[in-house]
Amino acid sequence: MLNKKPPYLILSLIMIKTQKSKQTAVRKLIPGNVISLKITAMGANNVGINEFTFGIPVLVPNAKLGETVQAKVLKILASKKIAIAKLIKVVTKTNATETNNLAALTPGATLDVTITKLGPNSTGIADLGNNYNNVNKLIVKKSAITIGEKVTVLVTRVKNGYAFGVATVSTQRLNQVSTSLTQNSFKGTKFTVVLPKNAKRYLKHLVFKVTTATAQNLSVNGFEQTLFKKGAVGLDTRINNQNGSAGNLTTVPTNTILFVKPNLGAKLGDKVQIQIIKFASIENGTLTYNVAIAKIIKLNPLSTPQKKAFVRSSLRQMLKSGMHYGEKAIKCNARMKNYVWTRKKGTDTKVEARPLIKKGRNLINLLKTRRCLTKALAQLTKYAAKGKTFLFVGTKKAASGLVARAALFSKKAFFVNTRWLGGMLTNWKTILKSISKIRPILKEKQMIIKDILEKRQTIKARLIQKALLLRKKSKLMLKKGRLLIQMLKQNNSNSTSGKQAVRFLFTEKTNLLNTKRKEFVSKGILLLEKRQQLVVKRQELITQSQTLKSKAIQLTNTISQFIKQFNLFT
């Protein structure tokens, strides 16, 4: 009896067990859920990573490699495609036993290694031997890597038996290369910088000193090292260089004073792209100072992912508008073959690539067209800044409206959107002669149209005047009728003889009114007949103008034929 537990304790134990079983059974990656996972890799700052269980990496701080743990999901970052979890319990610990006193390799360590083997996607493999108890090989990411190359590597991720790293440049190498640079090597170089908020002003320039150019922590995906941040200037082009030589590294020395002119509306704290105009070194005893004068080229320059997104959006717009459809393959010019998509069967170098044809039309390479359009835009902006005039030409139906709109919007341009006359630019003298012949015909046409319009206006004015007179007369008649009605009402009380006299007068006046009405009706009929005659005359004039127009077209055709014959003879 004493060993038996009370019923409420048994119920509480059952509830705790069921809750634990529920926690371990959850497999969905939702914030708040408790999940069980195995740590397959180690990142920086002692962060354990599970890479493959849930499709996206799950970061668990303070976890060790090889452990199976229970963790509570805190956040899921959809933009970076990672999840963050909090360690609750270690289910199974690592089985690794330290048989020797060797140290363990951790992320963030820098090593000098020699590449012994090449891997895929610009990677190299370095053998670490028995220097560490958890890693034997190191996979290094670097463009144009070669076997036997000595590289300084920053370890980014550690796994069971191997690790990943990124090639870096030490500060000693940076200082050695930067001191060996000459004035000409700096002149014209470009850097993306952030103007410090504590920069001082001297006349029209912002003045700030370059701090120590230290190598920053590099991400696994991006291997371009920018050494300008919070005052540090430089760009490590050696990492992305094909030769991989340190001679191509361009960095500003640490004891450099920069003079930057704040144009393009740049302010302190803004990200800008600068270009070095002048570079000089000043010696003061044992100390040497470098002075660089730069100008701002671009304000808030786009990063590489932003540039790619902008290019993709512009290509989508070009595809929607159908700019990739070329002319028929039969009409294709030989010079346009470089700007058309081509395909090649097999790997034989002797076989020429043929243009890609769909529905009898060539497909234009939109990447090349975009490059050419940007070049043309840059050239046009130069001419527009000088105040030059432009001629827009587009005779197709799709382009005619756009051409006219663009020319009218610019206010200093001309456009041709109906028909392009041959030799308008190359043979302007003959076209001027044909224009001089057409001008008198056009003047005659304008005079005829002007006469017709004047006659119409005079007829319209006369009709309006007559209508107004009729309106006045009708008003007078109405007044007289009202007076007669009043007189009749007054004379109703008089004798019958008076009534008969009034009736006689009323009949006489009605007769007069009827006669006048008939006269007005006859006049109106005459006016309508005159109007019909004028309409007939107008139609005759229109036919005459059409004949004149056809004669003008015939003249232009004969002129063009004459020009063609003349060109053939010449």
Swiss-Prot record:
Keyword Plastid: yes
GO CC terms in record: chloroplast; mitochondrial small ribosomal subunit
GO molecular function: structural constituent of ribosome
Record-annotated membrane-spanning stretches: none
Region (N-terminal extension): 1-306
PROSITE patterns for this protein: TRAM
Main location: plastid
Keywords from the named record: Chloroplast, Plastid, Repeat, Ribonucleoprotein, Ribosomal protein
Record flagged with keyword Ribonucleoprotein: yes
A GO BP entry: translation
Chain ranges of the TRAM domain: 28-89, 104-169
Localization per Swiss-Prot or TrEMBL: Plastid, Chloroplast
Matches recorded under Pfam families: Ribosomal_S2, TRAM
Family: Belongs to the universal ribosomal protein uS2 family.
PANTHER family: 30S RIBOSOMAL PROTEIN S2 PROKARYOTIC AND ORGANELLAR, SMALL RIBOSOMAL SUBUNIT PROTEIN US2M
Protein name: Small ribosomal subunit protein uS2c
